[in-house]
Amino acid sequence: MSVTPSPIETNAPKPLKKGSLVRVNPEAYKNSLESLASDQSSPEYIFEGPGELVAIKQDYGQVRWRRPVPDVWLRLDQLQAWTEGS
């Protein structure tokens, strides 16, 4: 009988899915096409979070902020999971 090795735990981030709470990763967003197409000074709330990931299409996610502002589409690699106090 073979023994199945236990999965190795890694610190890799969990993949984002619809309904996830997210924030924008400033390092990934800086100098991206999306940031260059926006105002020069990005609002702080996108980096503080949380925003809700309401849709995913290919490499992009639609984020809805808890503010009276329009939803935005950003690349998934520019988003990271939001945690309390992050």
From Swiss-Prot:
What are the record keywords, sorted?
Answer: Membrane, NAD, NADP, Plastoquinone, Quinone, Thylakoid, Translocase, Transport
> Do you know which InterPro entries this protein is assigned to?
NdhO (IPR020905)
Coiled-coil residue spans = none
Documented EC number(s): 7.1.1.-
Q: Which reaction does it catalyse?
A: a plastoquinone + NADH + (n+1) H(+)(in) = a plastoquinol + NAD(+) + n H(+)(out); a plastoquinone + NADPH + (n+1) H(+)(in) = a plastoquinol + NADP(+) + n H(+)(out)
Gene Ontology terms for molecular function = oxidoreductase activity, acting on NAD(P)H, quinone or similar compound as acceptor; quinone binding
Q: Where in the cell is it found?
A: Cellular thylakoid membrane
Pfam hit, one: NdhO
What's its membrane topology?
A: Peripheral membrane protein
Output the Gene Ontology cellular-component terms.
plasma membrane-derived thylakoid membrane
Name the source's superkingdom: Bacteria
> In which family does this protein belong, per the annotation?
Belongs to the complex I NdhO subunit family.
Function statement: NDH-1 shuttles electrons from an unknown electron donor, via FMN and iron-sulfur (Fe-S) centers, to quinones in the respiratory and/or the photosynthetic chain. The immediate electron acceptor for the enzyme in this species is believed to be plastoquinone. Couples the redox reaction to proton translocation, and thus conserves the redox energy in a proton gradient. Cyanobacterial NDH-1 also plays a role in inorganic carbon-concentration.
Q: How does it assemble?
A: NDH-1 can be composed of about 15 different subunits; different subcomplexes with different compositions have been identified which probably have different functions.
In Swiss-Prot or TrEMBL terms, this protein is called NAD(P)H-quinone oxidoreductase subunit O
Which species does the entry assign this protein to? Answer: Prochlorococcus marinus (strain SARG / CCMP1375 / SS120)
Q: What is the lineage of its organism?
A: Bacteria, Bacillati, Cyanobacteriota, Cyanophyceae, Synechococcales
